[in-house]
Amino acid sequence: EARAEVREGARVAALLHDDRGRVAGVRWSGSDGVARDLRAPLVVGADGRRSLVARAVGAELPYRSSASGRACYFGYWEDPDESWREIAAQWREGPDLGTAFPCDDGLVLALVQPPVGRREAFREDLEGAYRATIAAIPPLAARLAGARLVGRVRSATGIESYFRRSSGPGWALAGDAGHFKDPVTAQGIRDALRYGRLLGEAAAAVLDDPVALDRATAAWERQRELDCLEVYQWTNVLARGEPMSPIEVELYRAAAAEPSLAGDLLDVFSRARRPSRVLSPPRAALLAARALLRPGARRDALQ
């Protein structure tokens, strides 16, 4: 058993510190509004992009960040098409990007990510602009044929990918609190689960030794950055809100004709392979040459 004690309906108001300034717990209150102190050798802020813990320890400002060129709008649809029940798919049409994820209870999540410059149209008519963007991505529109939108359309704008300082004396930031990537590559849940587990494994054996604990959380943070940096950079390219480059077009054409390359691309999404292994310099040069040989090719588009 994990021997975890769960306190539902609790709200953390502040961090506690010992006489050396080390984080030593949290001040929280329940539904009765009474403030209580809970002390711990390690406080983990797994409290999202607007992390209270990050603010309290002075780590809110990222040391590496990239503003997304896309906004995000999504809704859930009743999905009668059983043939897609276990298939997630993503399409790009001009500057637009659309994704469909199968969910529980016969639902499919349909997400569109148009360039941020179109936000005004969504402000004026959220559902209308959402449906219009789906219609502008024919494969996504075909995927949703016969499906029915249930509930309201939701939005996420002002998206910024980042790395925050994520460890210090008695504290650590897990999940989106410490590192966030644009949802275009759908990596957030994977990374939150993986590095949350690795943080627990790193800290468990040294909770009674503050010096060793701080070393362990610092090493965990370094490993997370080494593991995630390349995917972060790849995500930022896809999040620019621009049409595919000629090299990207050639890459997907090649993948359509070469099952092994298609598998390699899927491995990038599943993190079994690094993006640089798929789009290596020799392959990029070959794809660029193919793009230049296309009728009407523009050399400036390859710069």
Where are these regions (language model features)?
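Predominantly flavin-linked oxidoreductase catalytic cores and closely associated redox partners
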Residues: 2-140
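Secondary-structure boundary/capping signal
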Residues: 6, 61, 141-142, 211, ...
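Alpha-helix boundary recognition
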Residues: 1, 134-135, 145, 154, ...
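Short acidic (Asp/Glu) and glycine-rich catalytic loops that position anionic groups and cofactors
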Residues: 110-112, 197, 230
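FAD/FMN-dependent oxidoreductases across multiple families
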Residues: 118-214
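C-terminal helical "tail/cap" subdomain of flavin- and related membrane-associated enzymes
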Residues: 204-303
